[in-house]
Swiss-Prot record:
Tissue specificity as recorded in UniProt: Expressed in fetal and adult brain.
Record's subcellular location: Nucleus
Bias-annotated ranges (Polar residues): 1-10
Name listed for the protein in its UniProt record: Zinc finger protein 713
């Protein structure tokens, strides 16, 4: 009899198979049926399942059906889906079996009814779609009523139809707590409170279809960003930066971590509820096992660990350049688009990076918030403080690959590298001169 873990593994394999099948679905929407993504059990197989495994089957079947509906397929609701939505135990009756298969086993029939649902109906208002998401969403049933849903519609220019581009989930109580903290932190640090709200944990679930109409991929294994399809990373949890290619892995990640008493929902660390305070106090509870460096936020530790592993999960679809951090990837995309969303309220100058805007503000205010712990000298930029502190510590983290010489600043290393470049250029010119000299030719 299969174990519960085996069924979880089977679900992951099933999702991978469905995503692979998506590239072959070049048929018209009218020819796609629910049976194409349904999973069948024989009577004997069904009797061997535990109740928890049957519940898992129910969740997967409902999710498959609702994904097709969300993508705009006009489907007649199968009888099995109607039963599963009522949370009735699916009992295989004699009169609900298909004809005997060639292998001699009977499989349950998926009957059609006259009921049809279409979540992307143009006549539906934002409130109606949100109500449908809250009432029917697989994620809502998994994560519970403490999550707020928001959707981001995409518009297909070819068929002039709207579809759900992405669903964002934010935790209600965490959002309220974090909003208060962000506002206080922004007030103390003279920052825009709207920018600080980006620290609120959220889950983004893309639900995109191929805009060329060539294929529909299960649950969308592509993220659509500013006209580019980028890397197969369906689910990213903003609180810790981890990426998951299966919803069940993300769910496990959220629910197996430590649970704050305030709301009962799980996050990667209890101190994630007070990260703004940690920034003020200087607390750094997250330590890298490789080099011992410490960080105040878990996402910064994860980003740092990619330096050791060499992982660069964010790939630009325009030029192929890869990045360790999503923020760097977003900033890079603005090179292609020319977007400068951060504008100075005093002089009107615009910037593509928020850090550039923050540093620019200090030209107007004269603020120097970064103070050296050794001598008390203050700086307007953290990078300048880091460079200055190395004069006290003697640290030289930038090393030349050619000769091994180390430097305290990257600018000094770049200047040093030009020496090797000039040396190589001189060697090349000398070699060419010797090659073309008469004495060399005569030999």
């Amino acid at each position: 009899m299969p174990s519960q873990n085996a069924v979880f593994s089977q679900e992951g394999n099933m999702e991978e198979e469905e995503m692979n099948d998506g590239s072959q679905m070049v048929r018209s929407q009218e020819s796609l049926t629910f049976q194409d993504v349904a999973v069948d059990f024989t009577r004997e197989e069904w009797d061997q399942l535990y109740p928890a495994q049957k519940n898992l089957y129910r969740d997967v079947m409902l999710e498959n059906y609702r994904n097709l509906v969300a993508l705009g397929y006009q489907l007649c609701k199968p009888e099995v889906i109607a039963q599963l939505e009522l949370e009735e135990e699916w009992v295989i009756e004699r009169d609900s079996l298909l004809d005997t298969h060639p292998d001699g086993e009977n499989r349950p029939e998926i009957k059609k009814s006259t009921t049809s649902q279409n979540i992307s109906d143009e006549n539906q208002t934002h409130e109606m779609i949100m109500e449908r998401l809250a009432g029917d969403s697989f994620w809502y049933s998994i994560l519970g009523g403490l999550w707020d849903f928001d959707y981001h519609p995409e518009f297909n220019q070819e068929n002039h139809k709207r579809y759900l581009g992405q669903v964002t989930l934010t935790h209600k109580k965490i959002t309220q707590e974090r909003s208060l903290e962000c506002n206080k932190f922004a007030e103390n640090c003279n920052l825009n409170s709207n920018l600080m709200q980006q620290r609120i944990p959220s889950i983004k679930i893309p639900l995109n279809s191929d805009t060329q109409g060539n294929s529909i991929k299960h649950n969308s294994d592509l993220i659509y960003y500013q006209g580019n399809y980028v890397r197969e990373t369906p689910y990213e949890y903003s609180e810790c930066g981890k990426i998951f290619n299966q919803h069940i892995l993300l769910t496990d990640h959220i629910h197996t971590a430590e649970k704050p008493s305030e709301c009962g929902k799980a996050f990667s660390h209890t101190s994630s509820l007070s990260q703004p305070q940690m920034l003020l106090t200087g607390e750094k509870p997250y330590k890298c096992d490789e080099c011992g460096k410490r960080f105040s936020q878990r996402i910064h530790l994860i980003q740092h660990q990619r330096i050791h592993t060499g992982e660069k999960p964010f790939i630009c679809n325009g030029c192929g350049k890869a990045f360790r951090q999503h923020s760097s990837f977003t900033q890079h995309l603005r090179i292609h688009t020319g977007e400068k969303p951060y504008k100075c309220n005093q002089c009107g100058k615009a910037f593509s990076r928020i850090t550039s805007l923050t540093e620019h503000h200090r030209l107007h205010t004269g603020e120097k918030p970064y103070e050296c712990g050794f001598c008390g000298k203050a700086f307007s930029q953290r990078t300048h403080l880091n460079q200055h502190e190395r004069t006290h510590t003697g640290e030289k983290p930038y090393k030349c690959n050619e000769c091994g010489k180390a430097f305290s600043q990257s600018a000094h290393l770049n200047q040093h590298r030009k020496i090797h470049t000039r040396e190589k250029l001189c060697e090349y010119k000398c070699e060419q001169t010797v090659r073309h000299s008469p004495s060399f030719s005569s030999t």
